[in-house]
Amino acid sequence: MLLWLTEILSQYFSSLTVFQYLTLRAILGILTALLISLVIGPVMIRKLSQYQIGQAVRDDGPQTHLSKAGTPTMGGALILVAIAISTLLWADLTNRYVWVVLLVTLLFGAIGWVDDYRKVVERNPRGLPARWKYFWQSVIGATAAIVLYVTASMPQETSLYLPFLKNVSLTLGPVLFILLTYFVIVGSSNAVNLTDGLDGLAIMPTVMVAGALAIFAYLSGHAQFANYLLIPHLPGTGELIIFCGALVGAGLGFLWFNTYPAQVFMGDVGALALGAALGTVAVIVRQEIVLFIMGGVFVMETISVILQVASFRLTGRRIFRMAPLHHHFELKGWPEPRVIVRFWVVTVVLVLIGLASLKIR
């Protein structure tokens, strides 16, 4: 929106051409989203407390979690508001990638909002039934996949690139592309949701991965950088640095209130949306495998749940003391802050490995 305005006004005030630069708009996007989160956050927390929109805690979970009962939840709405406003202000709104990512994020957030609303307002412990949750996730994920395939104009937009290998890619037909995109978006959404069980555990890795994806988006959209680094050149993806920057700013602002001991939880409205956002950006910049690496914490949490359920159904025994994985470490006696920070450290290492794929071929 402001880009369009500055383009018009730059005819009269040449200094406004500085707003054409992606890097400046990305920085402003980060700061705008951060400011919105910090300003609106206290107001939202008070309102959530006033209307008793608090977190319910399972009796069979770690006993240390019982003190969290009643903590305001659905705070992920704050993140989505900050991301949406900042993106609409600073991104090029004629860019199709911006709209695809933003709409997928908000629609997954809507699914999470309904789930949270039924749990905490209607006092329905099941929330949105799983079959309906996955149905709507599938509809949105598949629709996004079809849109991206139909609007693709170059082969590299629908190819799978293997990191750490020089000029190695797999051409995907419509079926494989749509299936891969669907699984990345829906899988990423649910993986982040499973990780969101401790104060700040999900949001900081999300911020770090989003920051790394912003780098991939910028480099992929720049012909010279992309050719030098042997990554696919995808015109237009550079604008996603604005969205990723807004996510980083909004996430850091939310972490201000979500850090241990949390004043607010993001709920499904935030976790499902942020996971879908990461998956969609990774698909657009053709870094699905790198997302799998950088989001290793999310992957481990998801695999722990799958293994736990499979083991119990097949043998009647559990592999972990409790799943997802972070609860296993809690029940082993690790204090919550230790679990959180160590998972953050793991994410830092994995993100650096993912970024190393830019140069190691």
From Swiss-Prot:
Subcellular location: Cell inner membrane
Record GO biological process: cell division; cell wall organization; peptidoglycan biosynthetic process; regulation of cell shape
S-S bonds: none
Transmembrane stretches, start-end: 26-46, 73-93, 97-117, 134-154, 168-188, 200-220, 237-257, 264-284, 289-309, 340-360
GO cellular component terms, A-Z: plasma membrane
Reaction it catalyzes: UDP-N-acetyl-alpha-D-muramoyl-L-alanyl-gamma-D-glutamyl-meso-2,6-diaminopimeloyl-D-alanyl-D-alanine + di-trans,octa-cis-undecaprenyl phosphate = di-trans,octa-cis-undecaprenyl diphospho-N-acetyl-alpha-D-muramoyl-L-alanyl-D-glutamyl-meso-2,6-diaminopimeloyl-D-alanyl-D-alanine + UMP
UniProt topology in membrane: Multi-pass membrane protein
Assigned EC number: 2.7.8.13
UniProt keyword annotations, A-Z: Cell cycle, Cell division, Cell inner membrane, Cell membrane, Cell shape, Cell wall biogenesis/degradation, Magnesium, Membrane, Metal-binding, Peptidoglycan synthesis, Transferase, Transmembrane, Transmembrane helix
InterPro entries per UniProt: Glycosyl_transferase_4, PNAcMuramoyl-5peptid_Trfase, PNAcMuramoyl-5peptid_Trfase_CS
Tagged with keyword Membrane: yes
PROSITE patterns tied to this protein: MRAY_1, MRAY_2
Cofactor or coenzyme needed: Mg(2+)
The protein's annotated pathway: Cell wall biogenesis; peptidoglycan biosynthesis
Molecular function per GO: metal ion binding; phospho-N-acetylmuramoyl-pentapeptide-transferase activity; UDP-N-acetylmuramoyl-L-alanyl-D-glutamyl-meso-2,6-diaminopimelyl-D-alanyl-D-alanine:undecaprenyl-phosphate transferase activity
PANTHER family per UniProt: PHOSPHO-N-ACETYLMURAMOYL-PENTAPEPTIDE-TRANSFERASE, PHOSPHO-N-ACETYLMURAMOYL-PENTAPEPTIDE-TRANSFERASE HOMOLOG
HAMAP family found in the cross-reference section: MraY
Entry function: Catalyzes the initial step of the lipid cycle reactions in the biosynthesis of the cell wall peptidoglycan: transfers peptidoglycan precursor phospho-MurNAc-pentapeptide from UDP-MurNAc-pentapeptide onto the lipid carrier undecaprenyl phosphate, yielding undecaprenyl-pyrophosphoryl-MurNAc-pentapeptide, known as lipid I.
Family: Belongs to the glycosyltransferase 4 family. MraY subfamily.
NCBIfam families in the cross-refs: mraY
Name under which the protein is recorded: Phospho-N-acetylmuramoyl-pentapeptide-transferase
Provenance organism: Marinobacter nauticus (strain ATCC 700491 / DSM 11845 / VT8)
Taxonomic placement: Bacteria, Pseudomonadati, Pseudomonadota, Gammaproteobacteria, Pseudomonadales
